Swiss-Prot record:
Transmembrane segments: none annotated. Pathway: Polyol metabolism; myo-inositol biosynthesis; myo-inositol from D-glucose 6-phosphate: step 2/2. Mg(2+) 2 binds at residues 93, 96, 224. It is found in: Cytoplasm. Phosphatase involved in the dephosphorylation of myo-inositol monophosphate to generate myo-inositol. Is also able to dephosphorylate scyllo-inositol-phosphate, myo-inositol 1,4-diphosphate, scyllo-inositol-1,3-diphosphate and scyllo-inositol-1,4-diphosphate. Also dephosphorylates in vitro other sugar-phosphates including D-galactose-1-phosphate, glucose-1-phosphate, glucose-6-phosphate, fructose-1-phosphate, beta-glycerophosphate and 2'-AMP. Homodimer. This is Inositol monophosphatase 1. It is an enzyme of class 3 (hydrolase). Inhibited by Li(+), Ca(2+) and Mn(2+), but also by Mg(2+) at concentrations above 3 mM. Substrate binds at residues 73, 95-98, 198-200, 217, 224. One of its GO terms (cellular component) is cytoplasm. GO terms for biological process: inositol biosynthetic process; inositol metabolic process; phosphatidylinositol phosphate biosynthetic process; signal transduction. Its main location: cytoplasm.
Length: 285
């Protein structure tokens, strides 16, 4: 039986991600014009390249699939909605790791997820400076540059290495009582270590490769998580909400791990913060 979405991933999403990545890499050699999305988050940056790449991705897909829906980071920032419907929907982060991009820190990715009936069917994450193309298709496995991926399978959190990020919130009280205290609780279990790469999509792909045993973060958006979520699960990993419940793409928080045991153990340690959902429904508690 023909798998139309597999073909869509292989011959459209991958080629568009690679083309977008070449634009990003070229822009890294030029002066970057930096903007701040909101005065409430002075570390939440955006550049003209983010906007250019997203427009290119959406226009390329619309040529072939004019009836499809789109949720893009820069489109939402400009006032577009981010409600996920049953319609085939492309969920796009043109540059995941914009702060890395601004500083030329070499971990930036183009992230393209595709959902039908609110379920992610496939994801493509192109870590363009590294030239690593991560793909995951529901029920078909996940790969990096054609090599099949498998999580570490680690179940003992005391033998784990975990990735997280401090995010863009620079409120001193928040940093002290939430961000750093969550890290402290995990380090004191103890665990082997905590790392930060600066891009949610690549962080999750590192879990899929087995290079890290887990990644957690709160304050994300659906475009940060969509593509990589299926890459992790197809590599044998577990995706949960930060509370330990079922993962919800619109919840703005995630734990992705090599095993359910580690994911649930992390959830027990985390102080949960209230977050506005991407779909505008009631605030997460």
């Amino acid at each position: 039986m023909e798998d139309r979405w597999q073909e869509c991933m292989d011959f459209l999403a991958v080629s568009i991600a690679r083309k977008a990545g070449s634009v990003v890499c070229a822009a890294l050699k030029e002066d970057v014009s930096i903007m701040v999305k909101t005065s409430l988050a002075p570390a939440d940056l955006v550049t003209a390249t983010d906007q250019k790449v997203e427009e290119m991705i959406i226009s390329s897909i619309k040529e072939k699939y004019p009836s499809h829906s789109f949720i893009g980071e820069e489109s939402v920032a400009a006032g577009a909605g981010s409600t996920l419907t049953d319609n085939p929907t492309w969920i796009i982060d043109p540059i995941d790791g914009t702060t890395n991009f601004v500083h030329r820190f070499p971990f930036v990715a183009v992230s393209i997820g595709f959902a039908v009936h609110k379920q992610v069917e496939f994801g493509v994450v192109y870590s363009c400076v590294e030239d690593k193309m991560y793909t995951g298709r529901k029920g078909k496995g996940s790969f990096c540059n054609g090599q099949k991926l498998q999580v570490s399978g680690q179940k003992d959190i005391t033998k784990s290495m975990i990735i997280t990020e401090l995010g863009s919130n620079r409120n001193p009280e928040f940093i002290k009582t939430v961000s750093l205290s969550n890290m402290e609780r995990l380090l004191c279990i103890p665990i082997h270590g905590i790392r930060a790469v600066g891009t949610a999509a690549v962080n999750m792909c590192l879990v899929a490769t087995g290079g890290a045993d887990a990644y957690y973060e709160m304050g994300l958006h659906c475009w940060d998580m969509a593509a990589a979520s299926v890459i992790v699960t197809e590599a044998g990993g577990t995706i949960l909400d930060a509370t330990g419940g079922l993962f919800d793409l619109m919840s703005c928080r995630i734990i992705s791990a090599s095993s359910r045991e580690i994911a649930e153990r992390i959830a027990k340690e985390l102080q949960i913060i209230p977050l506005e959902r991407d779909d505008g429904k009631s605030t997460n508690s």
